[in-house]
Amino acid sequence: MGIKQWLLSLVVVAISATATQARVDDPAGKAAQYHKEYALFRSANMPSPDKLASGVGFHSFRIPAVVRTNTGRILAFAEGRRHNNRDYGDINLVYKRTKSPTNNGENPTDWESLREVVGTGPHTWGNPTPVVDGNTIYLFLSMNDGAYSQNGGNTLPDGTKTKTIDSTWVGRRHLYLTTSTDDGDTWTKPVDMTKTLTPDGQAWDAVGPGNGIKLSTGELVIPAQGRNIIGHGPSGNRTWSMQVLKGAGSEGTICQTPDGKLMRNDRPGPMGHRSVARGTLAGFGPFATDNGLPDPACQGSILSYNSDEPARTIFMNSASTDRRTAMRVRISYDKDAAKFNFGRELKDAPLGNVGNEGGYSSMTKTSDYKIGALVESDWYEDKGGEKSHRCIIWRRFNLSWIINGPNN
C-alpha cells in the first residue's frame, strides 16, 4: 500500500469511527423505534371534516402551533380558513385539546372536538404563537381587518377586492394577546398589544408562528417579525417589551441552546437556506446563512428537547431549496446547535389520504418523551391554487426513530 492510500484509509476509518461513535453515544437510539401519524385538523373535502360546535366549517386549516401544558395536556392550534386556503379573508383561530393530561395524543379519539379561540367578524386572525408559563398559557396572534390583505387586490366571496395593508390603524396588521389559566379550556378576550410591541409605522407584521419559550432564567421569549417579544416578571403576570433584531426574517423560530444562549432560526427571504443568529437578551449577533439547512423560503420549527448530556436540539423543515414537500426532522448534539447531522425524512412514515405533506410545522415534547409534531398537507386539487384544500397532520415519534433513519 502506498503512503497516499494508507493516509486515505486512515481518514476513512477516522470519519467512520466518528460517525459511529456519534450514533452509539446516544442511548435513545437503542430503544425500539416508534412513530404514529394521522390527520388532526380535517379540511372540508375529507370524511368527517372538522367543524365548530356551531356547525361552522372550514375549507382549509393552515399555520399550526402546538404546546404541552404544565399538566401534560397538549394544545394544538391552527388557522381555520373559511372559504379557501389563502392568507386573506375570513380566518378564525381554532384549536383542539387532548381529552386528558395523560393520553399524549396517541390516538385520534384522544382529542376533544374543534373549538375557537377567536373569530370575531370577517377578520383575518392567525399566526398562533403560544408559550406556557406555569399555569398560564399566553397565546400571541396576528390580526388584520378582513377588507385588507398583504398585497391587496384579492377577491373576497362577495366579489370585492381587498385593499393593501398599510400603516394606518385600520389598515395595519395588529398583534394580539390572549391568556388561559385553565389548561386551555377558556381564553380571555384578546388584547391589542400593537402600540407597545410593534415598531411604529410598521404596516405588515407576523408573530411566530409556532411557539415561544421559557428560559432557564425565567423570562419568556416569543419570536416575531424583526424582533423578539420578551416577558419579564412573575409567571402569569408578565410585563412585555421588544428586542429589535437587525436582519431577522418575517417568520422566526427561537430556542435556548444547551450552552444557555438563544438562537433565532428564521425563514430566509429568497429560496435557499435558513437564516440563523445567536445571542442573549442583551443582544444578538448578525444573521448568517446556514448552508447545512436548505429551505424553500418557508416556516420551520425548533425544539429544545433536553440540555443534559447528550443534549439534543430538534429542527424540522422542508429540506429543499425549491419545494415544501421534503419534510425532514433533524437532531443536533452541539452545545450551540451548530450542526444538525442526524435526521430522517417524514416520508419514511407515509400517511395516505391526506394529500401532499409539507409546509409549516410545530413541535412539542410530550409527557411520554415523544416528539409531537403538527405538519401541513396540501391536497393540490387545482395545482396549488386557492381551491386546493389543506389539512394538518399530527405525528408522534421517538428519538430512536430519528436516529435510526436510513440516511444516517
UniProtKB/Swiss-Prot annotation:
Family of the protein in this entry: Belongs to the glycosyl hydrolase 33 family.
Which residues are tagged as glycosylated in the record? Answer: 237, 398
What start and end residues bound the annotated signal peptide?
1-22
Name of the protein this chain belongs to: Exo-alpha-sialidase ARB_03431
Q: What organism is this sequence from?
A: Arthroderma benhamiae (strain ATCC MYA-4681 / CBS 112371)
Query: Record's PANTHER family?
Result: EXO-ALPHA-SIALIDASE (PTHR10628:SF30), SIALIDASE (PTHR10628)
Q: What Enzyme Commission number does this protein have?
A: 3.2.1.18
UniProt cross-references to SUPFAM superfamilies, sorted A to Z:
Sialidases
Q: What is the documented function of this protein?
A: Sialidase is able to release sialic acid from a wide variety of natural substrates.
The places in or outside the cell where this protein is found are:
Secreted
State the InterPro entries in the record: Sialidase, Sialidase_fam, Sialidase_sf
Which keywords label this protein?
Carbohydrate metabolism, Glycoprotein, Glycosidase, Hydrolase, Secreted, Signal
